[in-house]
Curated annotation (Swiss-Prot):
One of its GO terms (biological process) is endocytosis. It comes from Arabidopsis thaliana. This is AP-2 complex subunit mu. InterPro entries: Adaptor_comp_med_subunit, AP2_Mu_C_sf, AP2_Mu_N, Clathrin_mu, Clathrin_mu_CS, Longin-like_dom_sf, MHD, Mu2_C. It is a peripheral membrane protein. The lineage of its organism: Eukaryota, Viridiplantae, Streptophyta, Embryophyta, Tracheophyta.
Length: 438
């Protein structure tokens, strides 16, 4: 369900209207007064970004010293409304040189009105791509892109890009060296018990691309996901090759991906935007490969002494290594003195966060390291208060490793001129919320 916005307002922190545009006649002109009275003056701006007053809903967001308010009179997709605001602000910043505040709006109100007419039609979001809009809406106002075309480049077809199927990529791009960079970046989230049992685990990942390709290329990406391999084996009428396959959950794609072909062939086919973009996002809950296992042992020796022993083992391949490994081991607030030994890296006590911070610059695969510590506590009078042990937290980054097991099987580029391309693929796994109870 789209936004179907009735009006949009830009207000300063005092509630003064800087700019507004009404797209439908189903709301009155006093909507901004209702927003001031029921939301701004009642100090409820930070509580909920969506409020319903009367028969209208207000979807608002603060950017710098400006409130952007979308008024909706019917049922609408609120998430789509926030997405529109974020992309609209990015568009304005691209025109204003990176700034978006009250002064920028006052200095460029004519341009903003022109953009508001282009990016939303009868309350429905349209094209918000800065690259496409700048072809026919310039800094000075209404001006044809043909009046300042470069002599050594083909003239972009603005009409095709605004109304055609490839509105995210302009024509006439040319590079001396055609390259594609693909990064699979994953964050692994874990909650493990003190005995090493996995209580909760999942991976959130994204496929990032940088494309420097001439012309209008078609790209096809093959992954070792279960659905794609099964579909490929059906089309070739033979069983799929043995090997690790994964099942992707909650997959979302960039608008450039051909969803019709994905639904029928289960392949990621697309005409890429120029430069950097996020091709897809996904989530995995089954078959996660944990990069580290942590086994903590904490003994309380009376009221004033503790012994801590933490063993960290890397589970990934022996030829790989992790960078920037940080292990935060919680200790009681009344810690007075610490003595510890580590087999690898360096450790110190940080009283501001009540943790032993163990840092290892480079952690090879299939190895283990140990921290042993003796902790002296301040003696307190009265009854002993039990210490609620927070979990151990880890930070790390493992190049060329994916916790999901996702791999690129192929990346093909077709373009009518038949040029050669260079493809680069990189894998990175980072720690999300990686916690071990102790």
């Amino acid at each position: 369900m789209p936004v179907a916005a009735s009006a949009i307002y830009f207000l300063n922190l005092r509630g003064d209207v800087l700019i507004n545009r009404t797209y439908r006649d189903d709301v009155g002109g006093n909507m901004v007064d209702a927003f001031r009275t029921h939301i701004m003056q009642t100090k409820e701006l930070g509580n909920c970004p969506v409020r319903q007053i009367g028969g209208c809903s207000f979807v608002y967001m603060r950017i710098s010293n400006v409130y952007i308010v979308i008024v909706v009179s019917s049922n609408a997709n609120v998430a789509c409304g926030f997405k529109f605001v974020v992309e609209a602000v990015a568009l304005f910043k691209s025109y204003f040189g990176g700034a978006f505040d009250e002064d920028a709006i006052r200095n460029n109100f004519v341009l903003i009105y022109e953009l508001l007419d282009e990016i939303m039609d009868f309350g429905y979001p349209q094209n918000l791509s800065p690259e496409i809009l700048k072809l026919y809406i310039t800094q000075e106002g209404v001006r044809s892109p043909f009046s300042s075309k470069p002599k050594d480049k083909p003239v972009p077809n603005a009409t095709l890009q605004v109304t055609g199927a490839v509105g995210w990529r302009r024509e006439g791009l040319a590079y001396k060296k055609n390259e594609v960079f693909l990064d699979i970046v994953e964050s692994v989230n874990l909650l493990m018990s003190s005995k090493g049992n996995v209580l909760r685990c999942d991976v959130t990942g994204k496929v990032l691309m940088k494309c420097f390709l001439s012309g209008m290329p078609d790209l096809k990406l093959g992954l070792n996901d279960k659905i794609g391999l099964e579909k490929e084996s059906e089309m070739k009428s033979r069983p799929a090759k043995s090997g690790k396959t994964i099942e992707l959950d909650d997959v979302t794609f960039h608008q450039c991906v051909n969803l019709t072909r994905f639904n029928s062939e289960k392949t990621v086919s697309f005409v890429p935007p120029d430069g950097e973009f996020e091709l897809m996002k996904y989530r995995i809950t089954e078959g996660v490969n944990l990069p580290f296992r942590v086994l903590p042992t904490i003994k309380e020796l009376g009221r004033t002494r503790m012994e801590v022993n933490v063993k960290v083992k890397s589970v990934f391949g022996a030829k790989m290594f992790a960078l920037g490994v940080v292990v935060k081991i919680p200790v009681p607030k009344q810690t007075a003195k610490t003595n510890f030994q580590v087999t690898t890296g360096r450790a110190k006590y940080n009283p501001s966060i009540d943790c032993l911070v163990w840092k290892i610059r480079k952690f090879p695969g299939q190895t283990e390291s140990t921290l042993s510590a003796e902790i002296e506590l301040i003696s307190t009078m009265g009854e002993k208060k039990s210490w609620t042990r927070p979990p151990i937290q880890m930070e790390f980054q493992v190049p060329m490793f994916t916790a999901s097991g996702l791999r690129v099987r192929f990346l093909k580029v077709w373009e009518k001129s038949g040029y050669n391309t260079v493809e680069w693929v990189r894998y990175i796994t980072k720690a999300g919320s990686y916690e071990i109870r102790c």
